[in-house]
Swiss-Prot record:
It comes from Pelobacter propionicus (strain DSM 2379 / NBRC 103807 / OttBd1). InterPro entries: DUF520, UPF0234-like_C, UPF0234_N, YajQ-like_sf. GO terms for molecular function: nucleotide binding. This is Nucleotide-binding protein Ppro_3093. Belongs to the YajQ family. The keyword Nucleotide-binding applies. Keywords: Nucleotide-binding. GO terms for cellular component: cytosol. HAMAP family: YajQ (MF_00632). It holds the Pfam family DUF520. Nucleotide-binding protein.
Length: 161
C-alpha cells in the first residue's frame, strides 16, 4: 500500500547561518549603534536580548528576514513571552520546533478524516504516516494539507509505492 510521512524538520545549520547573519547586520546597522542588543543560539532555541520592546521587535524582524532568506519557515518558530532582564533590558526566547506535537498530529488526522479521502493516518513519534490504496488519494491528501493553515511547517517525505 502506498504511503508517505508528514514531518516538521528544520535544518539547524541554516538556523545557525541565519542567526550569524542577523548578528552581523545588527552590529553594522545605524539604528542599533550604542545598543546592547544581541542574539545567541542555544540547542533548539534562539535568545534575543534588547534595550526595550521597540528594539526587541526590530531585532526579531531582522532575524525573521534572515530566516526567510534561508528558506526557514516562520511557522517553525514559537515565541516565548517577553521577560525583563538586568539593566532595564528585555529578553525573549524563540524556540525552533522540531517534529510534530501530539496535538498537531491529532489536528492533521482530523483534517484528513473530515475530507472523506480513502486514506488512513496515524501518529508515529513526531511524525504522521498516511497510507492509502492508490497514489491519487495520497496526492489529494497532500494538496488538502497544503491548502489548510495549520500553523506548523510540514514536509511530505518518504513517499512509497
Amino acid at each position: 500500500m502506498p504511503s508517505f510521512d508528514i514531518v516538521s524538520k528544520v535544518d539547524m545549520q541554516e538556523v545557525d547561518n541565519a542567526v550569524n547573519q542577523a548578528v552581523k547586520e545588527i552590529s553594522q546597522r545605524y539604528d542599533f549603534k550604542g545598543s546592547k542588543s544581541e542574539i545567541s543560539q542555544e540547542k533548539d532555541a534562539v535568545r534575543v536580548l534588547a534595550d526595550d520592546d521597540f528594539k526587541l521587535k526590530a531585532v526579531i524582524d531582522v532575524l525573521q528576514s534572515k530566516f526567510l532568506k534561508r528558506n526557514i519557515s516562520i511557522k517553525a518558530l514559537q515565541y516565548g513571552k517577553v521577560e525583563p532582564a538586568s539593566g532595564g533590558m528585555v529578553r525573549q526566547l524563540i524556540s525552533v520546533q522540531q517534529g510534530i506535537s501530539k496535538e498537531k498530529g491529532k489536528e492533521i488526522i482530523a483534517v484528513i478524516k473530515e475530507s472523506k479521502l480513502k486514506v488512513q493516518a496515524q501518529i508515529q513519534d513526531d511524525q504522521v504516516r498516511v497510507t492509502g490504496k492508490n497514489r491519487d488519494d495520497l496526492q489529494g491528501a497532500i494538496q488538502l494539507l497544503k491548502g489548510k493553515d495549520l500553523d506548523i511547517e510540514m514536509q511530505f517525505v518518504n513517499f512509497r509505492e
